[in-house]
Each structure stands twice: as structure tokens, then as C-alpha cells.
């Protein structure tokens, strides 16, 4: 089974498998099993063990690079179950090959297309369409939405099954889910045939007396008031403030790796922050690892509507190729995603990941009418790393947002088309749904996401504290801080009455001023535990959704809270996160390497305003530094003078606005930095992660004297074909004054820099906050020592 060794093509061990690496793995597997008729379900990176990666990443010489491995799931014709393997690309050998019988793999787009074809050509399905009122001439406009069947006790988990939600599109103009049909075929995808059709006791024929076309373009044209919006332009004439090398991105003081796989989509790894020249580890790995969408109606087929979109379909597989219609403005950097289809062919999703910057409003502001020299303000920008994926009728837009004050936000926007049902006129929905159109209803449902966080705050040994706001006996406000020691004690839920948050902290590192452990606070108020009853089909695999917070000891193979295989999993035994906790309920999670599992989401009670297409609705969570930095980490930002804005009448028409259809170009940003940490001291990995030493390998700049006038130049990256950014600034400097206000929100900050008065000093235009802080009477700067100190004046 050995194959000639393959020299892997990658920049970092966490990079996704390249096009050539995927092709190499497919060929190696086929040559190793030439007599087998196999199809591919998954070929993806098998991430290196954390211990191996951290040792290599933070060692002084970067020695001991982990082997490059692929994780493979294949199916063999007429053989139940799946074959799971590990392929070592470094050695050219298959290290693991196991057959799992009672297991159903992830459902790929190829399989969904096959199911649709099977259903539309089945004679019994065609008969049911006619019974529902579909005319003979309209049979070609019948479509199905293939879903995994969940778990159906009639069939167990030994067969690969799907259920087909049926729809009729009258004419050529409506969308594919215009009119729902009232029956549900069951398909055996291995036998490629319909094995049953579930039919309700009370039939619900399609409406014949209303225009149910539901064509979005047509409805748009029929709106009485068509508003032509004047275009809003986002431009970055001097380029972007981020740098990319391989899949590492450096922006402001953040540096992190962007991964991508078939199941989770975007994976953020090795997230560090540069504070005054020290590279401080924040998080080893952050990703969305599951999403449950349970529906609330009872009766015919509705009890099976409980999707696990990551575990059953894979949001990487379902990712849209992004374009300039996705809502991103400005200069955009894209990353593609390569996958293997069931035939072993390599397919590419172009522009699967978008990276761009957005204006973020006020960063901070202070006004003092008694001393206007003390007035300061700064405007913020944010970095957005995003993907968009389609899960059946829903569209999910996932945004990972990095802010200049050290905050990391996850925002998810939900839009798309409602999952609808056929109903009879005046039918009582018993509170389980809403009629959104004549004879069409939509069920109540939930969207529950599981965020997996593996922290690395100044080291590998972290803890989690529950923080509540309470009144003490004197009626004053105090915080209650509880640090659980076991996985059972750590289970908790959001409490709005106490404003509950969770501190992910390092008890071994205390803040020099507050004396509290350095931490990042998890703020999440879009929370709701799963409302399905325990033991029902809708609660299968949903152990992760029963509470908002779980904490477990770190294990390399514990990634997915619904287990490795979610499709058609029964509720007989605990799986995934539920199993890990039940196996060792007293496992210690204090001051050790931990994983935080957070369930958040929303409850959706549909309304007519959601039909025929839903306005986007957002949910948010934040990871915010608390007692982590010595001071506001965004103080290295130039003060803001917005020279590009203008006052105008709301009725003013600007003739110079260009056509909104003008094509914008994305730019690949230049990159010339090495993301590795250079540490000359021969310390243990744990010591290095407590507080990574100041990077001695980067070029140093002299400490600027307090009396010396700062004459730094903006180091904004210039795009090809643009004039040098420094020259541009010099030409405009006289117009903008000493504050250098032009394009202040495009001011570029490299992670490299020098210590200036205790703040991390970046080159930039005038008006730096360090200079402005000299006007505040109770603060001085000890430039000789390069430290920031507080002094009380006599």
C-alpha cells in the first residue's frame, strides 16, 4: 500500500490540502484498492496533533514539522457503511483503514442531485402529484428538496435514506418552492429508488384560486413604490490595512491563520495579538462545529424535520462562490476552496472566503468643555472574514469580525426562503406555525449553533469563570465570580437577570493593575436551549443544544458535538459532547488545556413579512478582552478628522455618482512577513505560551524622544498601479493639516513596531494619541525606560 513519497505543497501544517495534494490522495487510495468500486465522500486535512504543532510553531528553530496527513471517507459499492482512512502524504502510506458498518456519511451535493432525479421520475410520485392537483403539463415543474431522514425507527441506521420535501412551481417564473405538496417520498440512495411515500390522512390539494407564483422579480415589479437608491461608495484608494502570506493574515495587532474544511467551513487558528512588541497567544482554534434546526410542528413527517447542517451536509461543501453581489464593498481579498467529489474529481469553489475591511464607527471619544486640548476621538475600522452557505431553503452569512480594541465577534445573518407546508383553508395550525400566504404555512423552528473555542490565553492552562452581576447586602452592585472545577459543574446557561457572561481566563497570569486573571470575556445574549422534548426524534444528537455552556478537557479527536457521523444517528446512546461528558462527569477543567462549547441562536416564529423571501436577521456573540491588556489596546490609533465626508441636503443629487453596475476589482494583497515567532531563549513550549518573548527577529526602530517632533509616514499598502502611499500623503498633508485626517480609517498598522512611551508605536501621520495624551495632567511618559507610568502631581 506504499506509494512514492509526495512532497507536500503548503505553507503551514494547518493549511487545507491543495489541489495537487487532493489528487495525490485520491490516486493513492485507488491504487491501494484497485479491485474495489469506491466513491469518495470526504478527503480533507487531518490536522496535526496540537502538541506537535505547538512544539513546532513556538520552537526557536521551527524543528519537528508535523507530517502532512489526509482524512478520507469512502464508500464501496454494495457494501454497507463506510471506510475511514488516514493517508500520510509525507511518507506516502495509508496509516489507517477501518470499516464502520452502521454508519451513514455526510450527504454531498452530488447525492442530493441524484435523489432529485430519482424522485421526479418515480411513477408513484407522479401519481401523488396528480392527486394533489398538479396538471399533466406541470409535472416537469415538480421539484424536491432532499433532506436526511434523521432517524426513522421503521428503517434504523443500516440504510442510507433521504426524505424528499415536495414542491410545485407553476409556470416558468416562480421559485422552486412556490407551492408545497402534502406528501413525502422516502428514498434509498444506495438502491436508487423510492421505497415508501408518507401520505397524510387529510389531503391538502394545491391552491387553484390564488396566484401562488411567488416570483420574486415579478413581485418586485408590482410593488407600488420602487425606490431607486443612490449608490453608496466604499473606496480604499491607498489599499488595505492587512497583509496575507499563505493563509496567515496580519491586521492591526492581530495575526491568525485561516483554515477551511468540508464540515466547519472557516476555521480560525493560532490567533495572537501584539501588545507592545510581545506576541501574546489568544486562541488555538475557533470554529462553528454544528448547527441544529429543529421544527416545532407535530404529525405527518414534521417530526423528522431536524437538520444538522454541519454534521449532515457540511457547510464547506455548501459554500457559495462569492462575488461583488454578496454585499462586500471596497478592496476584497478572496480565497478558494478545493474539494473532492464522489467520482474522485477535484472541484473548486471560487472565492469561498472573503476578506475585507469596513468602517466601524467611533472607536473612542472624550470631550471636556473645560480643557479642549484634552478632547480626543478616533474612528474605527474592522476586518471581516466571511463565507456564505446555502442549507436547503436557508442562506447563512457567517462573519468573523476583528476589531481594533482586541474584540473578536461572530455574526451570523439568516435569510432565504421559508420551509413551507400545504394547508387547507381555515386549517387550525394549533400554534405550531403561521399562515404566510393563502393555503401555505410555515412552521415554528429554531436555529442553534455550536461554537467551539480552544483558548490559549498566555499559555495552554486556562479556566472558565461564570460572572454574574448581583446586589450585595448594602444594595450596591458587585460581581459574583465562580470557577467550576469539573465538566459537570461547568454546565451553565445565560441569565439575563444577572447579565451573565463567561470569562475564559489564565489563573497563572494576573493583571499588573487589577490583580485579576488575564481573560477574554464571552458575551452572548442570543441564546435559547433546544425546546424539543428529550427522548424525541427531534432531540437526537442535540445534547450540545440543551445548555449554553459546556467545558471539557482538550482532546485532539473531540471536534464535533454531534459525533463524527450525524446522519441517521439514533438516540439509543449518547454521542459526541453528551458522551464525552457522561463518560467522565468529574473530569477536571480548571487550570488545564480546555475546550469551551457555546450554544447560541434564535427562535423563529414565521410571519407574512418573511414571505416569499426573508429579510436578513442577525445574531451576534463577542470575545472581549478583560484584564488582558495594560490599557486600551486601540490607543495606537491616529485621531480622526474625516476629510472625505461632506454636509448636504437630503434632496441633493450628486451628478458625479457612477453607475451602480460598475464592476469593482478584488485585489490580492502583498505579503512579506514571516508569521513564526522567533524566540532565542531555549524554554519549554508552556513557558513560551505564557507570554511569548518580544520578537527579537524584527527590525528595531529608535525610541523617540518626548521633545522630538514625530514625523512618521503612513505605511498604507499601495496596490499595483497606484502611487506610493507616502508620496500621496505628503502631497495632501498641507490640505489635511497636522492631524493627517485623510483616509484616517485606512491607516495601516503592522504588527512590527517599536515601543513609544509604553504604547506600541506604529509609523503614521501626525496627531498620534501618545502626543495628545501629554495634555492630560495626571499622566506622564517615562521614555527612557520605554514604560507607561502613572504619576500623581503635587
Curated annotation (Swiss-Prot):
GO terms for cellular component: cytosol. Its cofactor is Cu cation; Zn(2+); L-topaquinone; Mn(2+). Its EC number is 1.4.3.21. One of its GO terms (molecular function) is oxidoreductase activity, acting on the CH-NH2 group of donors, oxygen as acceptor. The keyword Calcium does not apply. The modification 2',4',5'-topaquinone is found at residue 394. Topaquinone (TPQ) is generated by copper-dependent autoxidation of a specific tyrosyl residue. Residues 652-714 have a biased composition (Basic and acidic residues). The active site is at 309 (proton acceptor), 394 (schiff-base intermediate with substrate). Binds 1 copper ion per subunit. Can also use zinc ion as cofactor. InterPro entries: Cu_Am_Ox_Cu-bd, Cu_Am_ox_TPQ-bd, Cu_amine_oxidase, Cu_amine_oxidase_C, Cu_amine_oxidase_C_sf, Cu_amine_oxidase_N-reg, Cu_amine_oxidase_N2, Cu_amine_oxidase_N3. Belongs to the copper/topaquinone oxidase family. This is Copper amine oxidase-like protein cao2. It comes from Schizosaccharomyces pombe (strain 972 / ATCC 24843). The lineage of its organism: Eukaryota, Fungi, Dikarya, Ascomycota, Taphrinomycotina. The gene is cao2.
Amino acid at each position: 500500500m506504499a506509494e512514492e513519497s509526495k512532497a507536500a505543497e503548503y505553507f503551514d501544517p494547518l493549511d487545507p490540502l491543495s489541489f495537487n495534494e487532493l489528487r495525490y490522495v485520491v490516486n493513492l487510495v485507488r491504487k491501494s484498492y484497485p479491485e474495489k468500486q469506491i466513491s469518495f465522500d470526504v478527503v480533507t486535512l487531518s490536522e496535526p496533533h496540537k502538541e506537535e504543532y505547538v512544539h513546532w510553531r513556538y520552537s526557536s528553530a521551527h524543528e519537528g514539522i508535523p507530517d502532512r496527513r489526509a482524512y478520507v471517507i469512502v464508500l464501496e459499492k454494495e457494501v454497507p457503511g463506510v471506510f475511514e482512512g488516514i493517508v500520510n502524504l509525507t511518507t506516502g502510506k495509508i496509516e489507517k483503514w477501518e470499516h464502520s458498518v452502521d454508519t451513514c456519511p455526510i450527504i454531498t451535493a452530488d447525492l442530493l442531485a441524484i435523489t432529485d432525479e430519482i424522485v421526479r421520475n418515480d411513477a408513484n410520485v407522479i401519481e401523488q402529484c396528480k392527486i394533489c392537483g398538479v396538471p399533466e403539463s406541470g409535472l416537469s415543474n415538480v421539484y424536491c428538496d432532499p433532506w436526511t431522514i434523521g432517524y426513522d425507527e421503521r428503517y434504523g441506521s443500516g440504510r442510507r435514506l433521504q426524505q424528499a420535501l415536495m414542491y410545485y412551481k407553476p409556470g416558468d417564473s416562480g421559485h422552486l418552492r412556490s407551492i408545497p405538496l402534502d406528501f413525502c417520498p422516502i428514498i434509498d440512495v444506495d438502491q436508487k429508488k423510492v421505497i415508501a411515500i408518507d401520505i397524510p390522512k387529510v389531503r391538502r390539494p394545491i391552491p387553484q384560486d390564488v396566484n401562488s407564483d411567488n416570483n420574486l422579480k415579478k413581485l418586485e415589479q408590482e410593488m407600488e413604490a420602487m425606490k431607486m437608491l443612490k449608490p453608496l461608495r466604499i473606496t480604499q484608494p491607498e489599499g488595505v490595512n492587512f497583509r496575507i502570506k499563505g493563509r496567515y493574515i496580519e491586521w492591526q495587532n492581530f495575526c491568525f491563520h485561516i483554515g477551511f474544511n468540508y464540515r466547519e467551513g472557516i476555521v480560525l487558528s493560532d490567533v495572537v495579538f501584539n501588545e507592545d512588541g510581545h506576541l501574546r497567544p489568544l486562541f488555538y482554534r475557533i470554529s462553528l462545529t454544528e448547527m441544529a434546526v429543529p421544527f416545532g410542528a407535530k404529525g405527518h413527517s414534521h417530526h423528522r424535520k431536524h437538520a444538522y447542517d454541519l454534521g449532515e451536509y457540511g457547510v464547506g461543501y455548501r459554500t457559495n462562490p462569492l462575488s461583488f453581489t454578496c454585499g462586500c464593498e471596497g478592496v476584497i481579498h478572496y480565497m478558494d476552496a478545493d474539494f473532492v467529489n464522489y467520482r474522485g474529481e477535484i472541484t473548486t469553489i471560487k472565492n469561498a472566503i472573503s476578506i475585507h475591511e469596513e468602517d466601524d464607527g467611533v472607536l473612542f471619544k472624550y470631550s471636556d468643555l473645560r480643557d479642549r486640548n484634552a478632547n480626543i476621538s478616533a474612528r474605527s475600522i474592522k476586518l471581516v472574514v466571511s463565507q456564505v452557505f446555502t442549507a436547503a431553503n436557508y442562506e447563512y452569512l457567517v462573519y468573523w469580525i476583528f476589531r481594533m480594541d482586541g474584540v473578536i465577534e461572530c455574526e451570523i445573518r439568516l435569510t432565504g426562503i421559508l420551509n413551507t407546508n400545504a394547508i387547507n383553508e381555515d386549517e387550525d395550525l394549533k400554534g405550531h406555525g403561521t399562515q404566510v400566504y393563502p393555503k401555505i404555512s410555515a412552521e415554528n423552528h429554531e436555529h442553534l449553533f455550536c461554537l467551539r473555542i480552544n483558548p490559549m490565553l498566555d499559555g495552554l492552562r486556562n479556566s472558565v469563570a461564570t460572572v454574574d452581576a448581583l446586589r450585595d447586602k448594602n444594595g450596591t452592585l458587585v460581581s459574583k465570580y465562580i470557577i467550576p472545577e469539573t465538566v459537570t459543574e461547568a454546565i451553565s446557561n445565560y441569565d439575563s437577570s444577572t447579565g451573565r457572561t463567561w470569562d475564559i481566563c489564565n489563573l497563572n497570569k494576573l493583571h499588573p493593575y487589577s490583580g485579576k486573571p488575564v481573560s477574554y470575556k464571552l458575551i452572548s445574549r442570543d441564546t435559547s436551549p433546544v425546546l424539543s422534548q428529550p427522548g424525541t426524534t427531534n432531540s437526537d444528537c442535540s445534547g450540545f443544544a440543551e445548555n449554553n455552556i459546556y467545558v471539557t478537557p482538550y482532546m485532539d479527536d473531540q471536534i464535533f458535538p454531534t459525533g463524527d457521523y450525524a446522519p441517521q444517528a439514533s438516540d439509543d446512546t449518547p454521542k459526541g459532547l453528551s458522551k464525552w461528558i457522561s463518560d467522565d462527569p468529574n473530569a477536571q477543567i480548571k487550570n488545564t488545556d480546555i475546550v469551551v462549547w457555546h450554544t447560541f441562536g434564535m427562535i423563529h416564529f414565521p410571519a407574512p413579512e418573511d414571505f416569499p423571501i426573508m429579510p436578513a436577521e442577525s445574531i451576534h456573540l463577542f470575545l472581549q478582552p478583560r484584564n488582558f491588556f495594560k490599557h486600551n489596546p486601540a490607543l495606537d490609533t491616529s485621531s480622526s478628522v474625516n476629510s472625505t465626508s461632506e454636509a448636504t441636503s437630503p434632496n441633493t443629487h450628486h451628478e458625479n455618482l457612477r453607475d451602480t453596475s460598475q464592476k469593482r476589482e478584488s485585489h490580492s494583497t502583498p505579503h512579506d512577513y514571516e508569521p513564526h515567532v522567533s524566540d532565542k531563549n531555549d524554554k519549554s513550549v508552556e513557558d513560551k505560551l505564557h507570554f511569548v518573548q518580544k520578537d527579537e527577529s524584527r527590525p528595531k526602530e529608535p525610541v523617540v524622544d518626548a521633545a522630538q517632533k514625530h514625523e512618521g509616514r503612513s505605511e498604507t499598502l499601495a496596490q499595483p498601479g497606484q502611487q506610493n502611499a507616502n508620496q500621496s500623503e505628503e502631497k495632501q498633508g498641507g490640505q489635511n493639516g497636522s492631524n493627517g485626517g485623510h483616509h484616517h480609517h485606512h491607516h495601516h498598522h503592522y504588527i512590527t513596531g517599536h515601543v513609544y512611551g509604553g504604547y506600541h508605536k506604529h509609523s503614521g501621520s501626525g496627531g498620534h494619541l501618545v502626543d495628545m495624551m501629554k495634555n492630560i495632567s495626571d499622566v506622564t511618559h517615562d521614555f527612557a525606560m520605554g514604560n507607561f507610568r502613572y504619576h500623581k502631581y503635587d
